[in-house]
């Protein structure tokens, strides 16, 4: 749900019509109806008494680790050879990987695309912003997810029920490298302060059970990381196809485009 302090606001109207449009576009595949309701002050809600309305809506939750393992399982059932933890020293645009030759090479390596192209002396047509996102696992139970603005008001934060605990995130920090991301103290403070700004009963650092971080490969478009492109770009150099950007939700679209590129050769 999205909580609101004011009974009427531009944000309220924007999100109300936004979730209704999503439901309309989803048609019969909609997960459920959205609802705007008053928040009762004496209810067992976790929110502070400042909030008067909440917009409830349904969304899906994805376990990317389990999905990845399931995709590997499906690939093996189709007799696709998968080599994990297998080091590759070099590749080129003519389909050569180390000492072997292939019809096509698809470079789908997330934030490492530009790095590996440069390592193999291949010009990268796009620059990448390495944007770190960090999450906290809190020793707190909530009945449903909450979407709210952080204390800087530049992006939204989600607090989601997670295996009897709460998953809180995410941050958006530009980093120099995608290697070994981890949460820093400023991110931790930002998430805690943001969450406490809407809670009836504040939490402390003692409620943090664990944390994790990842790096998103966003196509660079300026100095403001918030305006970096969430889209993807496919670069083709002869038999080498390189993917810039993208995410789980755009993976099917990327796959279809790559199949089209290969079939049209």
What is each model feature region?
Residues 81-96:
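A conserved short coil-to-beta-strand element within the FAD-binding core of flavoproteins
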Residues 125-134, 138-142, 147-167, 173-265:
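C-terminal catalytic lobe of FAD-dependent flavoproteins
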Residues 98-104, 108:
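Core beta-strand elements of the Rossmann-like FAD/NAD(P) dinucleotide-binding domain
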Residues 107-123:
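Flavin (primarily FAD) binding-site architecture
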Residues 39-78, 171-178, 237-245:
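Helix-loop-beta segment of a Rossmann-like dinucleotide-binding subdomain
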Residues 74, 85-86, 150, 197:
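Flavin (primarily FAD) cofactor-binding/catalytic cores of flavoenzymes
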Residues 1-44:
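Dinucleotide-binding Rossmann-like beta1-alpha1 core, especially the glycine-rich loop
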């Amino acid at each position: 749900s999205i909580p609101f302090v004011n009974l009427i606001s531009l944000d309220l109207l924007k999100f109300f019509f936004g979730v209704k449009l999503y439901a309309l576009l989803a048609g019969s595949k909609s997960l459920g109806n959205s609802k705007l309701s008053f928040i009762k002050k004496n209810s067992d809600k976790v929110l502070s008494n400042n909030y008067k309305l909440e917009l409830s809506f349904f969304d899906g939750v994805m376990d990317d680790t389990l999905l990845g393992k399931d995709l590997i399982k499906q690939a093996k059932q189709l007799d696709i050879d998968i080599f994990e933890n297998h080091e590759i020293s070099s590749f080129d645009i003519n389909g050569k990987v180390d000492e072997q030759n292939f019809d096509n090479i698809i470079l789908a390596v997330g934030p490492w695309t530009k790095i590996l192209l440069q390592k193999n002396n291949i010009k990268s047509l796009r620059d990448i912003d390495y944007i770190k996102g960090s999450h906290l696992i809190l020793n707190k139970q909530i009945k449903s997810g909450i979407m709210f603005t952080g204390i800087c008001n530049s992006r939204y934060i989600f607090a989601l029920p997670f295996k009897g605990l709460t998953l809180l995130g995410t941050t958006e920090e530009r980093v120099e490298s995608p290697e070994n991301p981890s949460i820093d103290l400023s991110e931790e403070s930002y998430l805690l302060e943001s969450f406490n700004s809407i809670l009836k009963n504040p939490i402390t650092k003692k409620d943090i059970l664990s944390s994790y971080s990842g790096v998103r490969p966003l196509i660079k478009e300026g100095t403001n990381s918030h305006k970096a492109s969430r889209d993807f770009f496919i670069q083709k150099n002869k038999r080498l196809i390189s993917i810039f950007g993208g995410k789980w939700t755009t993976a099917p679209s990327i796959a279809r485009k790559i199949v089209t590129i290969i079939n049209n050769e």
